[in-house]
UniProtKB/Swiss-Prot annotation:
It is found in: Membrane. This is Inactive zinc metalloprotease C354.09c. The lineage of its organism: Eukaryota, Fungi, Dikarya, Ascomycota, Taphrinomycotina. InterPro entries: PA_dom_sf, Peptidase_M28, Peptidase_M28B, TFR-like_dimer_dom, TFR-like_dimer_dom_sf. Belongs to the peptidase M28 family. M28B subfamily. GO terms for biological process: protein transport to vacuole involved in ubiquitin-dependent protein catabolic process via the multivesicular body sorting pathway. It comes from Schizosaccharomyces pombe (strain 972 / ATCC 24843). SUPFAM superfamilies: PA domain, Transferrin receptor-like dimerisation domain, Zn-dependent exopeptidases. Residues 1-56 are annotated as: Disordered. Signal peptide: none annotated.
Length: 794
C-alpha cells in the first residue's frame, strides 16, 4: 500500500510514567540474585585465565596437525601467486573492490539483510502450543452485556445511532496496546424513509402496521419509531390494483402470464424471505409492475408452537416487520453509483437511473398479518389457485388463495417518501497488528450496522470482533510477539445496504490486496443455530477443521459442517472472493435439519437481547465457542510459516465442481474435453509442487515456529503462489451481463438467490445460448491453464 493511501496512522507514544522510570532505575541499580553469584564468580575467574603460550607442551598432537595444515596453506598461496598474480595486477584495484562490494550487497539483499529483520537473526516465534494456550486462557468478555450495550439503540448506517456506536467502539479499541486503530470514510448512496403509507381504496378497516417502536432501555416511555423500509427503494406514489405473485420467482410470474393474469401497472404482493427480497423486486420490475409489497412467512413455523411465540419464546409473531435490501446484487455489490471503483467524496459517479442495481419501482415490507389480510381481499378476484406450491402451507390461515387481477382487484394506494443521499458518509473502523512479513496480509471483518437494534444481526459479531482484537493485542503486548503476517481487522459499515463498506474498502485497496492478502475471514450473523458451519473455498477446509478441533478439545461440540459451494453473495465476503479472488471463510453457528431452531428476527426491531435470552444460555455459549474458533483460525492463517491453504484440497475440490457442469440443464450440448485436458495438467503440476514443499519442510522446518522468515526466499515464493492461486480463476472481462463479478467458478445467477457454480455457463444455457455457454467453457479452460502455470515453476 502506497504511502499516500496508508490508512493506519499510529498514535504518538506516551512518555514513560514516573512509576516506569522509578522501576527502570530500581532494576538497573539492584544487585543480582544470590543464586547467580557463584556462576558470575566462575565466569570472572575464567576470563582472567591466560591462554597457553606457544611454548606450552599441552596438546602436542594437535599442534603437529595444525603446523602441517599451515605449511600446506602457505604452499597453495605461493603457487596461486606465481600462476595468477600477473593477471590480477592488470585489473584495476577499484574494479576488484566494486565487484566484491556488489557481490556482498546482492547476497545480503537476497537473504533479506536489508529487510525489516536482519538475515543473521532468526525471527522468533513462540511455539504454537504457547500461543494456543495464551488464547485458551483469555477470558471472553461478558458477551451478553456487551451485546446489550451495542444494541441499545437502532444503528442504521448513516444515522446518529451508527455514529454513537462508532465512537463507542473506537474508544474501546484505543485502549488496546499493540494495535493501530483508525477509520476510513467513504461516501455512498443511501436512502432513509420519511413517510410510508398503505391503504385500500374505499376500505377504512385496513390499518397496516408500518412502524415498529423500539423501547429504549432504562428510559420509561421513551421509544424510537422505525418505519418499514427497504434499502435501495425509491420514492413514489402508486394507486393500482393488487395481484398476488406467490414467492416472486420467475416461474411464478410465468405461471401468472400463462394463466392470463398480467401484472403490468399493478401492485404485486409476494411472500419471500430476506435473501429473496431483491430478486422478487427485480422480477416484478421485469414484468412491469408499479410497486411491490413483501411479507415474510416465517410466522408459519410458529403455528405449531403458539405458546412459544415471542416474547414467551423464540418463535416470530405475525406482526413482525422484516427489513432488508432490494438492491439487485446480481449486478454488483457496494455503492450503487461507483461500481468497480471506490466511493470517495469527489470521485465520479454514475446517475442513479443508470445504476442497474437500483430498482425503479416502489417497495415496502409488510407484516404477515397484513399480507394475509390483503390475500383475503383478493378472494373472488382473478383465478382460484390450487397449485400446492402456492397455497398448501397457507391453508391453516387462509381458506382459499386467489391471484387477483388488474380488472377486478381492489385498488391500493402506496406512498413512499425517501430522503436519498448520493454522498452519505459511512465509516469503517480499522485495527491493525503488524507482522514480520509486510508483503502478506490477513483481513478479518464483521458488519456493524443494522436495520434496527440488531442484537443477533450485527451486535454479536461486533462483540466477538472486539474480543478477538483484544486477544491478539494483549498477546502481542504480553509476549512481545508479532504475527508472521500483518492482521487487518475491520468493522464494516453499511453492510445492510448491499455490503457497501467492505466493497468500497476492497475496491480502494484492490491492487494491494490482490498482491498481499492470503485470506479474508468473515463473521456476520454469528449464531442462528447449534451447528458450527464454515462456508469457504476447498483450500481452507483443513485449517478450519484444525481450528475447530482445538476448540473442541476444550468444549466438545457437534461435528463441524464445512461447505465449499454455497456463499451468501449479499454479505461482506462477496467482493473479496468474486471481485478480487481472495480465499474467504464465513464462520457461524447455523441451523440444521435435525434441529430447525427459529431464525433470528433479521431486520426486525424484535431482534433484541431479550429475544436471544429465550434460547437460554446455549446461544451465548455458542457465541463464546465461535470467538475461540475464530481466534485459532486467525492465529493459524497469520502465523503458520507456510500459508495453510491446502492446494491438494483446493484442486480436488475444483475437480468435483467441474464434474457438476454436466448437471446444468442443457449442458449435454457442450464440449468439455478442453476443460478435462487442462485439469489433468493441473493435477500433474500439483504433484510436483507438493513434492517441493514437502522436501523444503523436511530440510528446513525442524521447528515450524522458530524459522527465519528472511533466510528462506523459497518459502516466500511458495507462499506467494499459494496466496495467488485462487486469483487464477478470475477473468478481468467479468461475467456476461454482470461484469463486475470476475470469478468464473463462484457467483450469483439470474434464476434464484442461491449460490451458483459456473454462473456464466448456467445463465447462457438458461437462455438456450449454447454458443455463449461454449465460450464460457473455453474461458474456464484458460483459467485452469493459468492455475497450472501458477504452480508449474515452483
Amino acid at each position: 500500500m502506497t504511502d499516500e493511501k496508508h490508512v493506519y496512522v499510529p498514535p504518538p507514544k506516551d512518555p514513560p510514567s514516573y512509576e516506569e522510570v522509578a522501576l527502570h532505575s530500581a532494576l538497573n541499580n539492584s544487585a543480582p540474585p544470590n543464586d547467580g553469584e557463584q556462576n558470575e564468580t566462575s565466569m570472572e575467574e575464567m576470563e582472567i585465565i591466560e591462554p597457553p603460550s606457544e611454548d606450552s607442551s599441552r596438546f602436542p598432537l594437535l599442534r603437529t596437525k595444525l603446523a602441517a595444515i599451515h605449511e600446506g596453506w602457505e604452499s597453495a598461496c605461493h603457487s596461486f601467486e606465481i600462476r595468477f598474480a600477473s593477471t590480477f595486477h592488470r585489473i584495476p584495484f577499484q574494479f576488484l573492490y566494486l565487484a566484491v562490494i556488489a557481490t556482498v550487497i546482492i547476497l545480503a539483499s537476497y537473504y533479506g539483510y536489508f529487510d525489516g529483520v536482519p538475515a543473521w537473526r532468526s525471527v522468533h516465534h513462540y511455539g504454537e502450543d504457547v500461543l494456543l494456550n495464551y488464547i485458551k486462557g483469555c477470558d471472553i468478555s461478558d458477551t451478553r452485556q456487551q451485546v446489550m450495550t451495542l444494541s441499545s439503540i437502532p444503528h442504521l448506517a448513516g444515522t446518529v445511532g451508527d455514529s454513537s456506536l462508532l465512537q463507542m467502539i473506537m474508544n474501546r479499541l484505543y485502549y488496546e496496546k499493540g494495535t493501530i486503530v483508525d477509520f476510513r470514510e467513504f461516501y455512498a448512496y443511501l436512502n432513509f424513509p420519511q413517510l410510508v403509507s398503505l391503504s385500500i381504496d374505499g376500505d377504512d378497516s385496513f390499518h397496516p402496521s408500518l412502524i415498529e417502536s423500539y423501547q429504549v432501555g432504562g428510559y420509561d416511555g421513551v421509544s424510537i419509531p422505525t418505519p418499514a423500509t427497504f434499502g435501495g427503494s425509491p420514492s413514489g406514489f402508486v394507486n393500482a390494483p393488487l395481484v398476488y405473485a406467490n414467492r416472486g420467482r420467475i416461474e411464478d410470474f410465468e405461471w401468472l402470464v400463462n394463466s392470463g393474469i398480467y401484472v403490468e401497472s399493478s401492485i404485486v404482493l409476494v411472500r419471500a424471505n430476506q435473501s429473496d427480497f431483491a430478486l422478487a423486486t427485480a422480477n416484478a420490475e421485469k414484468y412491469n409492475a408499479s410497486a411491490i409489497l413483501i411479507f415474510e412467512d416465517t410466522y408459519l413455523t410458529s403455528l405449531d408452537n403458539l405458546n412459544q411465540v415471542y416474547p414467551a419464546g423464540p418463535y416470530p409473531s405475525a406482526n413482525s416487520l422484516y427489513r432488508g435490501s432490494v438492491a439487485n446484487h446480481y449486478y454488483y455489490v457496494g455503492d450503487p453509483l461507483t461500481p468497480g471503483w471506490s466511493a470517495h467524496e469527489e470521485t465520479n459517479r454514475i446517475s442513479p437511473k443508470d445504476a442497474n442495481v437500483l430498482p425503479s419501482i416502489v417497495s415496502i415490507p409488510i407484516t404477515f398479518n397484513d399480507g394475509i389480510e390483503l390475500l383475503k381481499r383478493l378472494q373472488g378476484h382473478g383465478h382460484l389457485v390450487k397449485d400446492s406450491n402456492w397455497c398448501q402451507d397457507l391453508a391453516p390461515v387462509l381458506s382459499e388463495v386467489w391471484t387477483g387481477s388488474k380488472i377486478s382487484s381492489p385498488g391500493l394506494e402506496v406512498n413512499v417518501l425517501q430522503d436519498i443521499e448520493d454522498k452519505q458518509k459511512i465509516i469503517n473502523i480499522m485495527a491493525q497488528i503488524d507482522g514480520y512479513e509486510s508483503d502478506q496480509i490477513l483481513v478479518v471483518g464483521a458488519p456493524r450496522d443494522s436495520w434496527c437494534t440488531g442484537a443477533s444481526d450485527s451486535s454479536v459479531g461486533t462483540s466477538l470482533l472486539i474480543d478477538v482484537i483484544s486477544t491478539f493485542a494483549n498477546m502481542a503486548q504480553d509476549l512481545s510477539w508479532k504475527p508472521r503476517r500483518t492482521i487487518v481487522f475491520a468493522s464494516w459499515d453499511a453492510r445492510q445496504f448491499n455490503a457497501i463498506g467492505s466493497t468500497e474498502f476492497l475496491e480502494y485497496w484492490k491492487e494491494s490486496l490482490e498482491a498481499k492478502a492470503v485470506a479474508y475471514i468473515n463473521v456476520d450473523v454469528a449464531v442462528s443455530g447449534d451447528t458450527f458451519t464454515a462456508r469457504t473455498v476447498p483450500g481452507l477446509k483443513k485449517v478450519i477443521q484444525r481450528a475447530f478441533d482445538v476448540a473442541n478439545e476444550e468444549d466438545e461440540m457437534k461435528a463441524a459442517n464445512i461447505i465449499t459451494d454455497d456463499f451468501d453473495y449479499t454479505s461482506d465476503l462477496t467482493s473479496f472472493l468474486t471481485f478480487a479472488g481472495i480465499p474467504v471463510v464465513n464462520l457461524a453457528f447455523e441451523r440444521n435439519e435435525e434441529n430447525p431452531t427459529p431464525m433470528p428476527f433479521l431486520g426486525s426491531c424484535e431482534d433484541t437481547v431479550s429475544w436471544i435470552d429465550t434460547f437460554g444460555s446455549e446461544y451465548w455459549e455458542n457465541a463464546a465457542r465461535l470467538g475461540k474458533i475464530w481466534s485459532y483460525l486467525i492465529l493459524f492463517l497469520a502465523n503458520d510459516p507456510v500459508v495453510p491453504y491446502d492446494l491438494e484440497d483446493e484442486i480436488n475440490g475444483v475437480g468435483e465442481m467441474l464434474k457438476r457442469i454436466p448437471e446444468i440443464p442443457g449442458a449435454n450440448a457442450l464440449d468439455l474435453r478442453k476443460i478435462n485436458e487442462e485439469f489433468s495438467e493441473l493435477l500433474e503440476s500439483l504433484i510436483r509442487f507438493e513434492d517441493e514443499i514437502r522436501e523444503w519442510k523436511s530440510l528446513m522446518m525442524h521447528n515450524s515456529y522458530t524459522v527465519s522468515v528472511k533466510k528462506h526466499p523459497e518459502l516466500e515464493g511458495y507462499n506467494a503462489k499459494l496466496a495467488r492461486f485462487e486469483r487464477s480463476f478470475l477473468d478481468e472481462a467479468g461475467l456476461p451481463g454482470h461484469e463486475w463479478y470476475k470469478h468464473l467458478i463462484y457467483g450469483p445467477n439470474l434464476r434464484n438467490s442461491h449460490s451458483q457454480l459456473f454462473p456464466s455457463i448456467f445463465d447462457a444455457l438458461l437462455y438456450g445460448d449454447v454458443e455463449a455457454a461454449q465460450k464460457e467453457v473455453k474461458r474456464i479452460a484458460l483459467a485452469l491453464d493459468r492455475a497450472h502455470n501458477e504452480i508449474r515453476f515452483a
